[in-house]
UniProtKB/Swiss-Prot annotation:
The gene is argB. SUPFAM superfamilies: Carbamate kinase-like. The record marks 37, 250 as: Transition state stabilizer. This is Acetylglutamate kinase. The keyword Transit peptide does not apply. Belongs to the acetylglutamate kinase family. ArgB subfamily. The lineage of its organism: Bacteria, Bacillati, Cyanobacteriota, Cyanophyceae, Oscillatoriophycideae.
Length: 292
């Protein structure tokens, strides 16, 4: 006869087993920096959002040093609509004129960033919100594409403020807005910002949370997930058109960060519950991992 106490004991043993399996990974990554680009459905679904924040806090509590980088495209579109500004895109990039740039900065720095900071702190962490302007963290330059306005790319990363924060147990949360040498604000791709910060901070891992299982050989077949590949294989997938559309800048930023010393880059499905913990603290791992 199976009693309820037996089920309870089995459940408790299962939890203990999970914790035991996590131990070698906690030991391996304690003190190491991991940069997480937070975006996609993980930002839109309140349940997933809470899980991601709690997972980030857990990683911090076991001695791993997470740095969060975020965008906020849907939120920007929503506020542009409220203000009667029609969102415009060119070759997948947001056309960012002066009025749009004001909204981008207001939403990313003043709203989305502070919401993430608040959620992490509510979950028991100690987060500090930043943008590229703070302590000259990121210097931007124009993207160089005609007709897209104040869309920029990363020119330089000055890590002093991030290093100070992580060394003292804080969780930095960085929004993808920065200025050039003249003080002009630019809208930056959050994936690219995450990759450049990971490289500058000599991070152990760069993790991009997306709305897909990872890199797929066949976009229409989730079972065609490529679990592990190296830089050369990643470049070949782009050349062959297997990696296309919005996945190209994600793979490119992973490749660039690896070339600058990041140990591993991961593209994960942010919709999967506790995907960060599965990737970092278990034997199985999830999503696609790119290595040098």
């Amino acid at each position: 006869m199976l009693k309820s106490t037996d089920l309870k004991n089995e459940s408790e043993m299962s939890r203990v087993k999970v914790l035991s399996e996590a131990l070698p990974y906690i030991q391996k990554f304690t003190g190491r920096k991991i940069v997480v680009k937070y975006g996609g459905a993980a930002m839109r679904d309140s349940n997933v959002k809470d899980q991601v924040m709690r997972d980030i806090v857990l990683l911090s509590c076991v001695g791993i040093r997470p740095i969060v980088v975020h965008g906020g495209g849907p939120e920007i579109n929503s506020w542009l609509g409220k203000l009667g500004i029609e969102p415009q895109f060119k070759d997948g990039l947001r056309v960012t004129d002066a009025s749009t740039m004001e909204v981008v900065e207001m939403v990313l720095v003043g709203k989305v960033n502070k919401e993430i900071v608040s959620l992490i702190n509510q979950a028991g962490g100690c987060a500090v919100g930043l943008c590229g302007k703070d302590a000259s963290l990121i210097q931007a330059r124009p993207e160089g594409i005609e007709g897209i306005g104040f869309v920029g790319e990363v020119s330089n990363v000055k890590i002093d403020i991030l290093q100070s924060l992580v060394d003292n147990g804080y969780i930095p949360v960085v929004s993808s807005v920065a200025t050039d040498e003249q003080g002009q604000a630019y809208n930056l791709n959050a994936d690219t910002v995450a990759g450049e910060i990971a490289a500058a901070m000599e991070a152990e891992k760069l993790i991009l949370l997306t709305d897909t299982a990872g890199i797929l050989e066949d976009y229409h077949n989730p079972d065609s997930l490529i679990v592990k590949l190296d830089i050369q294989e990643a470049r070949e997938l782009i050349e062959k058109g297997i990696v296309s559309g919005g996945m190209i800048p994600k793979v490119n930023c992973c490749v660039r960060s690896l070339a600058q010393g990041v140990r591993a880059a991961h593209i994960l499905d942010g919709r999967v519950p506790h995907v960060l913990l599965q990737e970092i603290l278990t034997d199985t791992g999830v999503g696609s991992m790119i290595v040098a």
